[in-house]
Amino acid sequence: MKKTVRSLCSTALALTLGFTLLSGPASVQAAGNADYNLAGFSQGNTGGGIISESNTSTYKKVYNATDLALALKKNSGVKVVEIMNDLDLGWNEIPSAAQTSPFAKHNDALTHPVLKQTGVSKITVDGFNGLTIFSANGSKIKHAAITVKRSSNVIIRNLEFDELWEWDESTKGDYDKNDWDYITLEDSSGVWIDHCTFNKAYDGLVDSKKGTSGVTISWSTFKGDDGSANSWVTRQINELEANKASYPMYNYLRSSAVGLSKQDVIAISGPQKKGHLVGATSLESANANLSITLHHNLYKDIQDRMPRLRGGNAHAYNIIMDAADARSAQSRITSAMATAIASKGYKFGITSNGAISTESGAVLVEKSVIKDVQXPCTQQSDRSDQRHVHR
């Protein structure tokens, strides 16, 4: 079911005309191509500027974790970071020379067989004013979460982020333990994320909080897992299937009490749970400063938060929210199965929300396509408390 409605949140949503979108990482576009120029709340952002590769004090080519640690160290003076190849950045797979600021050990993996081996790193980009991180070839960053804090005039371009999800047993499917987001923006201004691809993650994909303003996310793809034979989710479910006794929630879903097949679990686990949280703390005074633009993005089987706004302003245009496969996966759970799952306190199913605005936040979604999203725009707070109502 495709929805093209004209009354959404506080303003309007209309059918996209002439929409084009990249399906994956793309080469950096030639300068002067107006279709790819910066627009939205991050207007005027120049990142690290135009710097010659020969200026090795401010232009760093990164081939490994140690190179990246040196380039992103606070007060490094680096302005442009070019990622030259795929980087595996889990805490257990980077050398000791890289196990220092800005790298830190993230929360331990508990269930995914790969992440239990590689570990997960947290990379903090702190105090930069003018920084570009990009790849000319669409390099992939795996097993790491990046936090940009107290920074301004930052560009992140043409990168792919992958392998940061695992099955959640510890909070019974609520995914409230590991706090792994690919990118978190904190107390920053002027951040442009462009031509990137974000695969399934444990928590959010790109979150913005602590009053971060002037954010634009453009020409990017956000997607769940496709459930193929060697996909990230399939590898996780294979581990659970082989060790059911160690995973009570999974074992229950597969038991006769519920009756889901292994393939059912893979399909239902595939869609990404959350997109963009904008404002992490309810009623925080800094939330009024939040501002974000989303344009020319594909959200493929994202269940929620496109975006989820607590105060401030968000503008989304020329985006596609396509939840067709997620809707199909949800149909695998019968009402009797849902009752059985809930009776044990487990959370396993598909949410279907689009844009959410509360706490006097305003979202404008226009010139976009929404397909098979049950609640294209909603408010998840108590309407009786006017502090939680959108503008």
From Swiss-Prot:
Residues 1-30 form the signal peptide. Ca(2+) binds at residues 181, 203, 207. SMART domains: Amb_all. Its EC number is 4.2.2.2, 4.2.2.10. One of its GO terms (biological process) is pectin catabolic process. GO terms for molecular function: calcium ion binding; pectate lyase activity; pectin lyase activity. Belongs to the polysaccharide lyase 1 family. This is Pectate lyase B.
